[in-house]
């Protein structure tokens, strides 16, 4: 039988970039808090976590690409909140952000984690930012830690 590879949840020594959309900041700030908490609890130092704020979710892939291209990071976490309104704008933004982050994840050589909430209501977003449904920022950070370590294992 061949090898089994797993990424471990140890953030010590990992350099992580976080891109956060400012639109719906009352939600995204909670996602950021969750991500920072997860990174700290798994051993990351404050000095190893950089945060870039962008105007909204649509701008997230651009900043994530710049961070990835810098070569300084083991993983990038993207955080944002898009809440459905009465126009098709929601669909356009969600599709482009998801495609942009997915493309970066496949092309940059480092994990780029999608932590952007796409919800029908404000209540759903609040639930996913630290109340009933956990904190998706925390979950995105845990995925980033695991994938950064898995990437290192697979590169040996």
Curated annotation (Swiss-Prot):
It is an enzyme of class 2 (transferase). It comes from the Bacteria. GO terms for cellular component: cytosol; riboflavin synthase complex. Keywords: Riboflavin biosynthesis, Transferase. Disulfide bonds: none annotated. (2S)-2-hydroxy-3-oxobutyl phosphate binds at residues 86-87, 128. Signal peptide: none annotated. The keyword Transferase applies. Pathway: Cofactor biosynthesis; riboflavin biosynthesis; riboflavin from 2-hydroxy-3-oxobutyl phosphate and 5-amino-6-(D-ribitylamino)uracil: step 1/2. The active site is at 89 (proton donor). Its EC number is 2.5.1.78. The keyword Transferase applies. GO terms for biological process: riboflavin biosynthetic process. Forms an icosahedral capsid composed of 60 subunits, arranged as a dodecamer of pentamers. Belongs to the DMRL synthase family. This is 6,7-dimethyl-8-ribityllumazine synthase. The gene is ribH.
């Amino acid at each position: 039988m061949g090898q089994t590879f797993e990424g471990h949840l140890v953030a010590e020594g990992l350099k992580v970039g976080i891109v956060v959309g400012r639109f719906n900041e009352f939600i995204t700030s909670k996602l950021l808090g969750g991500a920072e908490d997860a990174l700290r609890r798994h051993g990351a130092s404050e000095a190893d976590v950089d945060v870039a704020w962008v105007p909204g979710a649509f701008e997230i892939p651009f900043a994530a690409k710049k961070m990835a291209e810098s070569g300084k990071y083991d993983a990038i976490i993207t955080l944002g909140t898009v809440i459905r309104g009465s126009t098709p704008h929601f669909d356009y933004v969600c599709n482009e952000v998801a495609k942009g982050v997915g493309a970066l994840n496949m092309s940059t050589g480092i994990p780029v984690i999608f932590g952007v909430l796409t919800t029908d209501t404000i209540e759903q977003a609040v639930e996913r930012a630290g109340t009933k449904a956990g904190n998706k920022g925390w979950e995105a950070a845990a995925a980033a830690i695991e994938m950064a370590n898995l990437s290192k294992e697979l590169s040996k």
